[in-house]
């Protein structure tokens, strides 16, 4: 049975109290609140010193029927209540491996790093697969993550896991293997100039004929671009393709 303390290890436990400047935290929360108002994603902040949620947006995607205030008060108990038990174990392992990997970067680079993974949230008899991203917002003087921002959206995958670690500005990224319990560097996805354009126009509702006319290409060429984009992204439909391309900042 997973316990809240299982989520906190040496790499993400802050022992020395940070400087809790109320103005800094207030400005941070107001900034995140403003971002939450204009995005479809759910956002919350984790305080790793107090080991609690600092802020939770009111987007219902993450809340599982609770209010934002209730989820904030639940803190990490929310995971124990709304994540399937076998996936809780996955999150504990990921939490440990992910924060140890964060520690391999210097303090400047840590601010450029983010981790992305997929798991289910259950509410009653219903369950939904989400994409969960974590990135540092504030570090302690020792380089520990003090405040982390989490962004939640619907997953474009069909299964859990798919853990990726990205550093802004790097083409390559790292994937985590639960079988090998290690990180592996992978070559980043690269789309040809025409491929994201085909995806974008497809998402806008244009037919193959209309896209071909817009891009001054043959229909066979459009089919070729679309098929190759799907193959590179590892998807089978346009919804997944748009989601995966957006996540990988390919537009």
Name every feature range the model reports, one short phrase each.
Residues 20-76, 170-178:
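PAS-family sensory domain signal
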Residues 46-69, 74-161:
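Sensory/regulatory domains in signal-transduction proteins
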Residues 171-194:
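Regulatory hinge/linker segments at domain boundaries
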Residues 195-202, 241:
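Short alpha-helical "packing" element that flanks the helix-turn-helix/winged-helix DNA-binding module
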Residues 205-240:
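Recognition helix of helix-turn-helix DNA-binding domains
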Residues 215, 244-251:
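Alpha-helical protein-protein interaction scaffolds
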């Amino acid at each position: 049975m997973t316990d809240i303390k299982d989520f906190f290890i040496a790499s993400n436990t802050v022992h020395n109290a940070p400087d809790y400047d109320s103005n800094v935290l207030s400005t941070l929360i107001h900034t995140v609140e403003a971002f939450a108002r204009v995005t479809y994603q759910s956002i919350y902040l984790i305080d790793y010193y107090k080991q609690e949620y600092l802020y939770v947006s009111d987007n219902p995607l993450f809340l599982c029927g609770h209010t934002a205030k209730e989820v904030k008060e639940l803190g990490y108990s929310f995971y124990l209540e709304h994540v399937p038990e076998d996936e809780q174990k996955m999150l504990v392992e990921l939490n440990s491996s992910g924060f140890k990997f964060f520690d391999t970067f210097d303090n400047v680079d840590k601010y450029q790093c983010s981790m992305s993974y997929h798991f289910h949230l259950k509410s009653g008899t219903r369950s939904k697969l989400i994409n969960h991203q974590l990135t540092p917002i504030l570090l302690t003087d020792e380089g520990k993550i003090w405040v982390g921002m989490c962004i939640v959206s619907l997953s474009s995958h069909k299964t859990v896991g798919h853990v990726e670690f990205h550093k802004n500005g790097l083409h390559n990224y790292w994937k985590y293997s639960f079988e090998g319990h290690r990180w592996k560097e992978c070559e980043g996805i690269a789309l040809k100039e025409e491929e994201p354009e085909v995806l974008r126009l497809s998402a806008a509702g244009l037919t193959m004929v209309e896209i071909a006319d817009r891009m001054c290409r043959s229909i066979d060429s459009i089919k070729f671009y679309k098929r190759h984009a799907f193959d590179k992204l590892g998807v089978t439909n346009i919804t997944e393709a748009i989601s995966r391309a957006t996540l990988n900042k390919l537009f």
